């Protein structure tokens, strides 16, 4: 690595609350972890829902248990926890009368959109963390543009955290699809490099494209 730029964006703001639930999808557990831990240290009652396609993609569950009052797990295939999506668990909790001052959702964009679809009708404060494609990290390239409350924002400068109830997720998902071909190329190149280096079958890598880290690939020997 010859160049490094950071930190980008603005610091995360933790709001005053009595009961907060975090919702993490895949690697979203990593940035969610320190936020919920800090809230717990402040005396906030903290719960978390962790989701993944299967058990091996459910991250930091044991670590969350050290300070969260309740840890819920959902997997697409039912290999761990509830079979289904994190939004199924969230909806069930709300329907059973659980009251949350805020929901913090971090994960794939479709997951965060689904969370907002649950919380918006209930007018529950919802924070999301956006990490779309970024090239220069200064807002000049415009790749990470997102509409929030009808205003243009840039995730690298104004984010990554935004009011989820105000994010135009449909536009965001459309813009992300614009770079699928480039992401596929990066993934294929990474696989070839892993093969050349003889990386083991278990190795998993997060590939940085510009200043973004959204493309995940498994190296195969």
Feature map (PLM): residue ranges:
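Generic, ordered loop/turn and secondary-structure boundary motif
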Residues: 9, 13, 131, 135, ...
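Short acidic, glycine/serine/threonine-rich loops at helix termini
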Residues: 116, 139, 167-168
């Amino acid at each position: 690595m010859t160049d490094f730029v950071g930190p980008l964006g603005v610091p995360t703001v933790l709001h005053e609350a009595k009961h907060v639930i975090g919702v993490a999808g895949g690697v979203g557990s990593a940035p969610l972890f320190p936020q919920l831990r800090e809230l717990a240290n402040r005396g906030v009652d903290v719960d978390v829902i962790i989701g993944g396609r299967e058990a091996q993609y459910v991250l930091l569950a044991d670590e969350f248990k050290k300070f969260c009052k309740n840890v819920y797990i959902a997997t697409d295939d039912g290999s761990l926890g509830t079979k289904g999506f994190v939004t199924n668990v969230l909806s069930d909790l709300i329907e059973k009368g659980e009251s949350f001052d805020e929901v913090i959702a971090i994960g794939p964009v479709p997951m965060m959109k689904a969370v907002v679809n649950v919380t918006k009708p209930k007018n529950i404060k919802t924070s999301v963390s956006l990490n779309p494609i970024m090239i220069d990290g200064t807002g000049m390239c415009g790749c990470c543009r997102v509409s929030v409350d009808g205003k243009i924002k840039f995730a690298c400068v104004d984010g990554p955290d935004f009011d989820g109830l105000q994010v135009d997720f449909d536009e965001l998902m459309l813009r992300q699809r614009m770079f699928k071909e480039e992401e596929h190329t990066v993934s294929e190149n990474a696989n070839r490099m892993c093969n050349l280096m003889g990386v083991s079958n278990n190795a998993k890598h997060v590939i940085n494209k510009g200043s973004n880290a959204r493309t995940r690939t498994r190296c195969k020997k």
